Design a protein with these regions (language model features):
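Conserved N-terminal structural module of periplasmic/extracytoplasmic solute-binding proteins
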Residues: 3-111, 116, 257, 292, ...
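Glycine-centered hinge/linker elements that transmit conformational signals in sensory
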Residues: 187, 227-257
Length: 434
């Protein structure tokens, strides 16, 4: 995808009051150095609604906005909101009194709010920054009307994490097939480990497991058609996904629906768990936050299930920034975005961010660690990448699937799978025909 995908083909076809009450505000107004910034916007201030609420991500974002101020001479006031709260209240936030700029996601999630008239097009910004990105990055930033609405910053892969020292000590081998993966999980359980750390209290993490199983079993095209309801949720292919997942559940951390992913990651850090399937944006970031041994952390791409598709696909979500329709200082906000859409801006952000990878063409990031270098390589091997269910599907459908998957986790029986598929299809018909 994008810079991180290294030119792979077929990529990713790809309330306001509550937010204010829950937010913290930081101002970036450095005066020294930098170039750019016009007399018309210099000294003005823009507000930035941010869901970068985890400590490590918040620090990296502060570095980016400070650099943006230095370059553009525009002050930035950041209003940080808990990540999940931001997402849950985004519609009422944008309809109310939003900040000038806000953090958001590429693909369908961007297109949805653009189509609702809640964001301003950024074609003039892209005229200036377009040469910094490949066509796939631009595609992921383009609305259904053909206009650009997002300036991307980074992407990151969803992969299976493990501690190198633990694998070496116990003589474990990285699995490349489903059978090897299940066999390894059984061995870990026998050895007294939690084979796979797992959490879904927040609802969205388990969507990633559905995504990867669906792409491994049925392929990328099938997955994207399912996300747009061109394939019914009662299809046999969906049943196969849940059946494979049910085979794996005895080896995943119990009580997942009552646990947040941060706590699951801590069991991996403590070497109580052998593996964890999640994004680098979460697990590697948590290692940094907890000052755990990041050098010991490694990952492998999810093993092959159907040889027809191998390991050709993965979720590699792209995050970036949008301009709200109700922005009070549009010109200054665009000046900030013109800086953010550059290689030097991404490099500045990635000096602190030790888990994501940038998208700009020719990006040079001397600070990339082993996880980031491997992320670039593995995303680059993909024939296509998805954005994640809550970005590729209608938001209402993704929300419905959160509840359905949590019910599946509680009861993975064959009868319940069939019942949940029917429920998903009934809700999909209502959502996609409305």
């Amino acid at each position: 995808m994008l810079r991180g995908v290294a030119g792979a083909a077929g990529l990713a076809a790809v309330s306001g009051g509550l937010l204010t009450a829950c937010s913290s505000s930081d101002s970036s107004d450095k005066k020294s150095g930098g170039s750019g910034g016009t007399a018309s916007v210099a000294g003005s201030t823009v507000t930035f609604g941010s869901n970068y609420s985890d400590p490590a991500a918040k620090t990296a974002f502060a570095a980016l906005t400070t650099a943006a101020t230095t370059s553009s001479k525009v002050k930035v006031t950041v209003n940080t909101v808990d990540h999940n709260t931001f997402q849950d209240n985004i519609t009422s936030y944008l309809q109310g009194t939003p900040d000038d700029l806000f953090t958001w996601f590429a693909g369908y999630r961007m297109q949805y709010f653009a189509a609702q008239g809640l964001a301003q097009p950024l074609d003039d910004v892209w005229e200036k920054i377009g040469g910094n990105f490949g066509p796939a990055a631009k595609q992921l930033s383009t609305g259904l009307d053909g206009h650009q609405y997002l300036v991307p910053l980074y992407n990151y892969p969803w992969v299976v994490f493990y501690n190198k020292s633990e694998f070496a000590k116990r003589h474990y081998t990285v699995p490349t097939t489903w059978d090897e993966y299940v066999t390894l999980a059984k061995k870990m359980k026998t050895d007294g480990l939690i084979p796979i750390a797992f959490a879904d209290k927040d609802g969205w993490p388990a969507l990633g497991t559905f995504d990867i199983l669906n792409m491994r079993i049925n392929g990328y095209d099938y997955h994207m058609k399912l996300m747009s309801h061109k394939i019914p949720w009662t299809d046999a292919g969906v049943a196969t996904v849940f059946q494979h997942w049910a085979e794996l559940l005895p080896y995943t951390q119990s009580g997942a629906n009552g646990r947040i992913w941060q706590d699951a990651a801590k069991t991996l850090e403590a070497k109580q768990a052998g593996m964890m399937f999640q994004g680098t944006n979460q697990v590697a970031a948590q290692y940094v936050t907890d000052k755990a041994n990041l050098d010991d952390l490694d990952f492998f791409t999810f093993p092959t299930v159907n040889p027809k598709w191998g390991q050709d696909y993965m979720d590699a979500p792209t995050d970036g920034f949008m301009l709200s329709k109700k922005a009070k200082n549009t010109d200054a906000a665009k000046a900030i975005l013109e800086y953010i859409g550059t290689g030097p801006a991404e490099a500045e952000y990635l000096k602190t961010d030790q888990w994501d990878v940038g998208l700009a063409n020719g990006l040079q990031v001397p600070t990339y660690n082993a996880i980031q270098k491997k992320s670039v390589a593995e995303i680059g091997k993909c024939k296509a990448v998805a954005q994640f269910m809550d970005r590729d599907a209608d938001p209402a459908m993704a929300k419905a699937m959160i509840s359905i998957i949590q019910k599946f986790i509680d009861d993975p029986s064959t009868g319940n799978i069939a019942s949940l598929q029917k429920s998903a299809e009934q809700q999909a018909k209502a959502i996609y025909t409305s």
